[in-house]
Amino acid sequence: MTFSVDKVRADFPVLSREVNGLPLAYLDSAASAQKPSQVIDSEAEFYRHGYAAVHRGIHTLSAQATEKMENVRKRASLFINARSAEELVFVRGTTEGINLVANSWGNSNVRAGDNIIISQMEHHANIVPWQMLCARVGAELRVIPLNPDGTLQLETLPNLFDEKTRLLAITHVSNVLGTENPLAEMITLAHQHGAKVLVDGAQAVMHHPVDVQALDCDFYVFSGHKLYGPTGIGILYVKEALLQEMPPWEGGGSMIATVSLSEGTTWTKAPWRFEAGTPNTGGIIGLGAALEYVSALGLNNIAEYEQNLMHYALSQLESVPDLTLYGPRNRLGVIAFNLGKHHAYDVGSFLDNYGIAVRTGHHCAMPLMAYYNVPAMCRASLAMYNTHEEVDRLVTGLQRIHRLLG
């Protein structure tokens, strides 16, 4: 199948609008991607003609809604090549998935004197839950430091492991730098030391295929809204043997086998014991449509197009005076930068006046900002619906801002 960015753009209604009298150039997909009509329509159709509570009744609408929900679980398992659909838990997003692991597996397996390894490039969602866990149990949080080029100092990693290391929690792709970490060697090293591995895949799954069996990670988590799906839905993958051993984190309906006031409560089997309460069924349906949409385009086709676009963008940005780029040459999805001494918010505001949407701030990565000694950065995201013309507009906009502000 030949990838056509024009055909892809036609599926995204918002891309036809104007901002400040100019065509929208949406370069903020790493924060949250836009939604194709196929996703919007699938969720709307479900609410119009097929909505009912799942796992709640024997009537037709409930049975059909339950079947649709479980079919999405199966589709998601194929998307990341899990061994079984029952290794996947529906969560609100990457943040909840990581917190689930920290509060279920973590509370059961991390003790005083143990340690967890993260990196200096992590999103706060892959820092704070582990800080909280370590504070609760008296464990130590160890950090893989950064290199100036935005890669990790992997030579330090072997010395961070010891017999008390319980977990390596690492991002697949940095949400600021676009660095893709060498997971295979990191996971192998962790397993050699008896540690489990959690991978934050929020910035990876939309850019190229992910195979959790080939990676051999123990946990993998991602969000639907960055994958052209709805907000409020994500996937947590856990190896089946681990998942079956994990206790529930939240209590309520759907996650129980029996409830007795005198004899207590027993849990249903995984993954359903981690899905207390009425789920975001509409969001799950929309996620299924997003997975179907991306799969039909072909992740390898998407990867090839986006990489060509990234190479073009990096080469064109070299023409902007006083522009500082952060991260390695080989990267996925994002370009973080600052223009001279101007605050990222000011640069982002000017770009918005030109119809260009970029993200500004610390990007939920304050330790990374501290490493580079800046309060904030601008971040342009490149997704499958972005074009060379939009890159040119970004470059022209930055050149214009430099002329205006000096």
UniProtKB/Swiss-Prot annotation:
Catalytic reaction(s) noted: (sulfur carrier)-H + L-cysteine = (sulfur carrier)-SH + L-alanine; L-selenocysteine + AH2 = hydrogenselenide + L-alanine + A + H(+)
PTM-bearing positions, type N6-(pyridoxal phosphate)lysine: K226
Subcellular location: Cytoplasm
InterPro entries: Aminotrans_V_dom (IPR000192), Aminotrans_V_PyrdxlP_BS (IPR020578), Cys_dSase_SufS (IPR010970), PyrdxlP-dep_Trfase (IPR015424), PyrdxlP-dep_Trfase_major (IPR015421), PyrdxlP-dep_Trfase_small (IPR015422)
Quaternary state and interactors: Homodimer. Interacts with SufE and the SufBCD complex composed of SufB, SufC and SufD. The interaction with SufE is required to mediate the direct transfer of the sulfur atom from the S-sulfanylcysteine.
Family of this protein: Belongs to the class-V pyridoxal-phosphate-dependent aminotransferase family. Csd subfamily.
UniProt-recorded name of the protein: Cysteine desulfurase
Organism: Escherichia coli O8 (strain IAI1)
